[in-house]
Amino acid sequence: RASRNLPAILLASQLRPGFYGFLLRAGVDLPFSADHYGLSLVLGGAEVSMRELGGLYAMLANKGVWRHPRLYEGEAAGSAVPLLSPEAAVVTLRMLEDDAHFVRSKEGPVPLRFKTGTSNGFRDAWTAGVVGPYVLVVWVGNFDNTPNPLLVGGDVAAPLFTDIAQALASDAGPLDDLG
């Protein structure tokens, strides 16, 4: 699959209000000003936690409505913050879908909607996405931040993401799809 970085930069340059404000409304902690990040923000130019990243994917799965991410059942979800139209959320998830990537559940194939990433200098490899009602974020790296040329998201984090998604699909009942 070809990278979609250039269209993402073009789109971000046209957003009003900007992507920086969108991320702030989605609970992402950005310690510097919008000018500090510029358009690099759309390509991962700021550090985000796994919880923040998961919250963004959950917002897509919730048809554009963001809530503080819950890590366990029973944790308060907080108030709803509409950030995208339902149509924009569904279109975005469908852009992340690939016919070749799905898991099998008792109800049949379930598409995986995900994005991989590799940090500058090969310090982090990650995959984040949605499978049925679940949001998964997988990070692979060294806790001391040392680089490793093998830390490529599509090579090391994506297979783990797929394995976890398959385990969830095998253990769960029907995995609801986007209606």
Each predicted region: which residue ranges?
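A penicillin-recognizing enzyme superfamily signal
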Residues: R1, S49-G179
